[in-house]
Amino acid sequence: MPEPVAEPALNGLRLNLRIVSIVMFNFASYLTIGLPLAVLPGYVHDVMGFSAFWAGLVISLQYFATLLSRPHAGRYADLLGPKKIVVFGLCGCFLSGLGYLTAGLTASLPVISLLLLCLGRVILGIGQSFAGTGSTLWGVGVVGSLHIGRVISWNGIVTYGAMAMGAPLGVVFYHWGGLQALALIIMGVALVAILLAIPRPTVKASKGKPLPFRAVLGRVWLYGMALALASAGFGVIATFITLFYDAKGWDGAAFALTLFSCAFVGTRLLFPNGINRIGGLNVAMICFSVEIIGLLLVGVATMPWMAKIGVLLAGAGFSLVFPALGVVAVKAVPQQNQGAALATYTVFMDLSLGVTGPLAGLVMSWAGVPVIYLAAAGLVAIALLLTWRLKKRPPEHVPEAASSS
């Protein structure tokens, strides 16, 4: 975790602008993810002629690479400082675009082209984990650890914004100039972000001996488990709400997803100080309660308006879960280990979203689509009970390393 810069207290618009000036680098990294997201599956399957398995694998490789590299991103951010990690991650985003470009240029050699696409996706996954983790820690270093919840919230907002913008823009660029044009746009976005990041003032890396990964995991895993359980609700809505609407014979699944996203972003914008005012665990428990009600409404919905209200509540409830628990998880370790703690904590969400789809698909094929929303509500209820137990647990003293004093 970087050492915060000592300067007058920030608040209001000035604070938000300072945070946005850093998390915009995470926006750039997620824009490079969103731009090819709606293009590559069809390109691999329809243009290159590979099976749906390979089309899915090309997309999934990025997520696996992000999952595996995220703990390393946090540890290197603690050791080297977050700015270097952000620039490194953005370089990975640039190289992923180069991979797409060379894949397009070697389209006459399908196997080589596919390998280059896969390589680009792996590099993108590594780049995103470094840019995302680094930008959060850089933002905290700039505005101070008091505002860590707000930094995490803004990171989530720019993530959703970049993905929402990137997918339709990517389709437009692809229809305009093919895969090569899309690749050049991706490289351009990453290059501009790198050039903007390099002259920015750095923040010092924290001094002190880092804890081993096992020790960091031991401090944050309960918060990560609560996050993973709550993420199941997000996973079943994002993945299966279209099938749910089809099974009911309703229209409007896309609008339901829009409602979820609006509730998610709107809640973060409306309650920026909630975590500081009433505490991360209290906010998390309130959020779990709202998310449970929303998921239950979706599961028992007999009319489209019931499902839409449920999706809206689920989005609002899930919105602050990550920053609320993240603030507490990060503060459970010494300052020089907080980058590793944040990255390790985030892995639980990555894992949850990775396994929710297949497991929910099995449950759906056995018991029907509505049941997966009721099951997800049950998992969030377990997260609520776990967080309640964590709140009742006596606070632990977190010693700072002697060398950091």
UniProtKB/Swiss-Prot annotation:
Location of this chain's protein in the cell: Cell inner membrane
A Pfam cross-reference name: MFS_1
Keyword field: Cell inner membrane, Cell membrane, Membrane, Transmembrane, Transmembrane helix, Transport
PROSITE patterns the UniProt entry points to: MFS
Gene Ontology CC: one annotated term: plasma membrane
SUPFAM superfamilies named among the record's database cross-references: MFS general substrate transporter
Residue ranges of the TM segments: 19-39, 47-67, 85-105, 107-127, 156-176, 178-198, 224-244, 252-272, 283-303, 309-329, 344-364, 366-386
GO molecular function: transmembrane transporter activity
Residues in coiled coil: none
Membrane topology: Multi-pass membrane protein
Organism domain of life: Bacteria
Annotated family: Belongs to the major facilitator superfamily. YhhS family.
Name assigned to this protein: Uncharacterized MFS-type transporter YhhS
Species in which this protein is naturally found: Shigella flexneri
